[in-house]
Amino acid sequence: MDRQPVLEGERLLLRPLAAEDWDALYAVASDPLVWELHPAHDRWQEPVFRAYFADALAQGGALAVIDKTSGAIIGSSRMQAYDPAGGGSIEIGWTFLARSHWGGGTNREMKRLMLAHALKYVARVDFRVGETNLRSRRAMEKIGGRLTDRDGGVVQTASGPARHVVYEITRDNFAFGPLQTG
């Protein structure tokens, strides 16, 4: 499975994240409000984001999200933890968007593109979300994510441990879910 495809929608282009994207992506990430509810709420700080960016490049699977109208990078997301066993699964996450693109359908289109690609190869897509990140949890529910009873683990952040929950979207849920119907 290609974890760094080029995906194009009506308003968005998703393409592999490259080292040359640093300045444009950090311009988005340097807004503290982007990370306000995120467990790693200090990610707007340059040294913290540099480590995050380097990890994204090293791990592979990271995508730059581009507004087709302006040509600007407006965020990023990743496909990680591909497991072909048992029908296959992959995790989509590490997503953030410029505040100018909150609430207007950008996340919906981005996730629809990523899910349509991933679900050609796997039966299930998982999303680990910070337990207290209510903005991301609401966004998951809007796109048809189902909260599972699987433990999302604890991630160590600058402010201490942060518990995560796991949402999932299966191939069948996606085919008949809100991303297909409106």
Language model feature labels by segment:
Residues M1-G104, H117-L119, R124-V125, E131-L134, ...:
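GNAT-family acyltransferases
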